[in-house]
Every structure is written in structure tokens, then in C-alpha cells.
Amino acid sequence: MKELLLMALANGLVNNVVLSRFLGLCSFMGVSNKIESAMGMAMATTFVLTMSTCVGWLIEHLILQPLGLEYLRLLAFIMVIASLVQLTELFVAKQSPELHRTLGIFLPLITTNCAVLGIALLTVQEKLSFLETLIYGLSSALGYSLVIVLFAGMRERLEQTAQPALFKGAPLSFITAGILAMAFAGFAGLAG
């Protein structure tokens, strides 16, 4: 139990999928202008990342490995992710049309979010059990969610301040993301 808790802390805070592994930067930078849209993207990505990691593990261990079809792993995982994204998009469009409009193109782009595919592939590479895979996927997703919402809050606050013209927009966003990454590096002592 202690190992699973340490894995969750290490994954969510220390080895954060965005700030440490640099996965999922497209949606991280693109949707983090407002807290509301960042929270919507965080929820959608959390669902897709967690579910795709678990379903990917099942496909790997129940179909691909027994049949010697490991070379189809990438294709199978992409199909799982695309299916889950379609389900998520249908749900969001029906439940919250405003959020669906806010997320725009970024919702279907979860299909190509390298964080989702990367975490699913990492769990297979590290030969984790199903429970470890679930914890790994969920903690990575929650770490992504935490960072994108914090970053959106920081960007909203920065929009209300006077900024030098040279730093407006992307330059200040990248500097802010770098400072956030340094802050999360302070959690390194938690993982042992």
C-alpha cells in the first residue's frame, strides 16, 4: 500500500507528465487561458488517460501478448484512445454545450495528446500490474489536471497585470511554465 501511495505522489508531483516528462504540452499551453476551460480539459483528459491506460493494459495482457501481436500495440492503443475521446466528446457536447464550444478543437485533439499515449505505453514498458497501472494512470492524469488548472490560474492573474510588450503572450507563458516546473521540482524529496 505504501508503495502505491509513493508511486501516486511521485507520478503526480515529482515526475509530472507535463513538467517533468514534457508530454501533453499542446493542450497545456492551448487550453490554459481560463480556469473554466482548463478544468474542462483536465476532467476530459483525466477520464481518457485513466481509462485508456487500464483498457490498454487489458488489451496488452489478454490479447496482444498471448497471441504474439505486440507489434500492434501502438495501433491498438491509438484506437482505444480515439474511441474514448469520441465517447467523452459526445458526453461533453450533450451535458455542457458551452464547455464543448470553449474546448473547441482541443477536445478531439486528446486523441493525439502524447501524454495519453505515452502513459499507456510507459505502463506496459514498466511491466506494472493492473492495480499499479490504474494508480499510475490516475495519478498521472491528476498531476496533469493539477498543473493545467494552476497554470490557467496563473495566466488569468498575469493578464490583469501590466506586462512588457516583449513578454506578452507566449513568452510570458513559457516563463511561467518554467517557474511552475521549478516549484514542482521541490517535491523531489517526497518520492524518496
Short names for language-model regions:
Residues 1-5, 58-71, 121-134, 188-192:
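Helix-coil boundary and interhelical linker segments in multi-pass alpha-helical membrane proteins
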Residues 3-18, 67-83, 134-147:
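Structural signature of hydrophobic alpha-helical transmembrane segments
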Residues 7, 14, 45, 50, ...:
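Hydrophobic core segments of alpha-helical transmembrane domains in multi-pass membrane transport
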Residues 22-30, 89-94, 105-107, 114-127:
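Generic transmembrane alpha-helix signature in multi-pass membrane proteins
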Residues 23-37, 85-99, 151-162:
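C-terminal ends of transmembrane helices
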Residues 36-47, 71-77, 99-110, 166-172:
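Cytoplasmic-side transmembrane-helix entry/capping segments in multi-pass membrane proteins
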Residues 61-104:
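Ordered, amphipathic secondary-structure segments that act as subunit-interaction surfaces
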Residues 156-174:
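Interfacial loop-to-transmembrane junctions
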